[in-house]
């Protein structure tokens, strides 16, 4: 109850009222399961209950774990299964220096090609709804794009909220 009423409330508002198109999972765990690989958080609540249709990404160099196991940087398969679409940051995807377990777990049957395709579809869907693609495909005009980027009277300028004193 505390999770939903306090910790997730801001995310719920951002998704349902603010139209958020991307969400970043935290660098931490809830009840022993790291959020980046939590199916309950990334799919059940975010996508199914709240209707989120964007992309989910990890915090940088996030860890993940299987229930009852220690969190590891190499455990990326739980993220795939949870519908966490993008792992941030991979220094060289071709050589896999982080030794992620996606290919191994795919061959072991722990994740499916369908889950990988679902994550890819989430990313592609996000890109296809980007203002750049909408403009290129004539689904919006330059004036509409400019209107999207125009500051409204009641918009908050984040720079005005921060003051740095030396």
Predicted regions and their residues:
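Glycoside hydrolase catalytic-domain context in secreted enzymes
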Residues: 1-166
């Amino acid at each position: 109850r505390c999770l939903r009423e306090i910790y997730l409330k801001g995310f719920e508002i951002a998704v349902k009222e603010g139209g958020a198109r991307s969400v970043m999972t935290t660098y931490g765990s809830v009840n022993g399961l790291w959020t980046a690989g939590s199916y309950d958080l990334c799919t059940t609540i975010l996508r199914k209950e709240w209707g989120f249709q964007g992309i989910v990404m990890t915090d940088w160099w996030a860890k993940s774990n299987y229930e009852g196991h220690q969190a590891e940087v190499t455990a990326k398969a739980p993220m795939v299964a949870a519908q966490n679409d993008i792992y941030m940051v991979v220094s060289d995807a071709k050589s896999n220096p982080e030794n992620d377990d996606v290919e191994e777990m795919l061959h072991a049957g722990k994740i499916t090609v369908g889950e990988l395709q679902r994550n890819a579809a989430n990313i592609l869907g996000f890109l296809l709804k980007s203002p750049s693609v909408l403009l290129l495909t004539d689904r919006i005009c330059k004036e509409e794009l400019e209107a999207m980027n125009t500051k409204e009277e009641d918009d908050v300028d984040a720079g005005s909220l921060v003051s740095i004193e030396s």
